[in-house]
Regions:
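Alpha-helical transmembrane segments in multi-pass membrane proteins
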Residues: 108-112, 116, 120, 206, ...
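Membrane-embedded catalytic cores of phosphoryl/pyrophosphoryl-handling enzymes
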Residues: 136-248
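Interfacial segments of alpha-helical transmembrane regions
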Residues: 23-30, 88-117
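N-terminal transmembrane-helix/juxtamembrane module of multi-pass inner/ER membrane proteins
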Residues: 1-83, 124-138, 245-247
Length: 248
């Protein structure tokens, strides 16, 4: 095993800081699809629902028994309010290896979520798409329709959970977290269609926005835990090396 590079951070850390072409391509594709969907909605007279929107909306209205509607409301509630921020902070804390790293990672995860929320809010106000008719709603909703706030928020939190699991969990636990996070985010988004407060294209826009934003951020930062850029060695072997170098 090669010794740490005395001239700077270890080679692994320098490689982690490089942008991933794959992540950049995913971010570009998601951004392009989001832009195409937004332009399509804006060019429709009155920002009316797209053909697929109306068909799925009508299906939801005719398949809403009380039990499923109540369950959908409960699941949707987990994607708004304080819950997403608590989950994001928890995900960030799990990515650290000690108290300091857990604190910094939790704050970084919250910052990523808040920045994403600000971007979503700005786009929602700029697009200003009306929601489905109020008579079709089976829950409370506010604001404009696109992109869906619940869908974007839950997808952002799911992405942060997947990032945390990739850095701080064993393989089996990692796959469990990834699966649960994706299923939860998808479920929250679908409830917004089922409850009649969003068009399907609103939910798709939220997913695309979250995916594009997170993959672009991961490409820029190398997807590393934020504390990796701090001037402290990542492990005891590197700390011993620096202590020896300083004594010399």
């Amino acid at each position: 095993m090669s010794a740490p590079d005395p001239a700077g951070p270890p080679r692994e850390a320098r490689r982690a800081r490089r942008s991933s072409p794959g992540q950049l391509w995913v971010a570009a594709v998601c951004t392009a699809l989001f832009a195409a969907l937004t332009i399509t909605v804006l060019t429709v007279d009155g920002k009316r629902p797209l053909p697929g929107d109306q068909a799925l909306h009508t299906w939801a209205l005719t398949h809403r028994p009380d039990a499923l509607t109540a369950a959908a409301r409960t699941l949707a509630d987990s994607g708004t309010g304080l819950w997403p921020y608590l989950l994001a902070a928890l995900a960030g804390s799990l990515a650290g290896r000690n108290a300091r790293e857990r604190t910094v990672s939790a704050v970084a995860a919250l910052a990523v979520l808040l920045l994403g929320q600000g971007l979503r809010q700005a786009l929602m106000l700029a697009i200003a798409r009306p929601r489905p008719p109020h008579a079709d709603w089976a829950t409370h909703a506010s604001g404009f329709s696109m992109p869906s706030g619940h869908s974007t928020t839950s997808a952002l939190v799911a992405g942060l959970a997947c990032w945390a699991a990739a850095h701080g969990a064993r393989r089996i636990l990692r796959w469990c977290v990834w699966g649960l996070a994706v299923v939860w985010a998808a479920g929250v988004g679908l409830t917004r269609i089922y409850l009649g407060v969003h068009w399907p294209s609103d939910v798709l826009a939220g997913w695309l926005l979250a995916a594009g934003y997170l993959t672009a951020l991961a490409a820029v930062t190398g997807g590393r835990v934020p504390v990796a850029c701090a001037p402290f060695p990542a492990n005891s072997r590197q700390r011993r090396h620096l202590r020896t170098r300083d004594m010399g």
